[in-house]
């Protein structure tokens, strides 16, 4: 099959974060095939991630959107636990990117958060695949943020 990396996203999301991640991964991982799997909602992401990794992909980025209701937040919790299980059981990289609809009131601000977060985490996934587990060590403790301005380190 050759080298591949996965993108799993949802139709529930209000921003096409999957395309943002795909663009970054194509640029940062030339020669890799990108497998994209779009599912209805956030609780479907663990299964999608597992299917992608079962195809021989080295890692996957999952892009979820959480609504404002309490039920949505509980669904996120279930999905998050599922994604952690996939990562632990497969031993492969799973980068969970999530936007919570109550992070901002204005749709434009939510869109900016989603795009920034998807882009930065896709960069993280590409670095981990290219350079291995020490790829992000140089950024440890630097207060980097995805979706917001970096906070910086506390010295």
UniProtKB/Swiss-Prot annotation:
Its EC number is 2.5.1.9. GO terms for cellular component: riboflavin synthase complex. Pfam families: DMRL_synthase. GO terms for biological process: riboflavin biosynthetic process. It catalyses: 2 6,7-dimethyl-8-(1-D-ribityl)lumazine + H(+) = 5-amino-6-(D-ribitylamino)uracil + riboflavin. Gene3D superfamilies: Lumazine/riboflavin synthase. GO terms for molecular function: riboflavin synthase activity. Belongs to the DMRL synthase family. This is Riboflavin synthase.
């Amino acid at each position: 099959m050759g080298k591949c990396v996965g993108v799993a996203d949802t139709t529930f999301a209000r921003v096409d974060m999957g395309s943002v991640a795909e663009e970054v991964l194509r640029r940062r991982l030339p020669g890799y095939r990108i497998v994209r799997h779009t599912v209805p909602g956030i609780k479907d992401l663990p299964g999608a991630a597992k299917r992608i990794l079962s195809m021989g992909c080295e890692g996957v980025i999952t892009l979820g959107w959480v609504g404002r209701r309490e039920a949505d937040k509980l669904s996120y919790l279930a999905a998050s636990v599922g994604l952690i299980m996939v990562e632990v059981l497969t031993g492969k990289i799973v980068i969970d990117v999530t936007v919570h609809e109550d992070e901002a009131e204005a749709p434009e601000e939510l869109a900016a958060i989603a795009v920034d977060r998807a882009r930065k985490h896709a960069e993280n996934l590409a670095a981990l695949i290219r350079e291995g587990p020490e790829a992000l060590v140089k950024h440890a403790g630097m207060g980097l943020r995805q979706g917001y301005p970096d906070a910086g380190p506390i010295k």
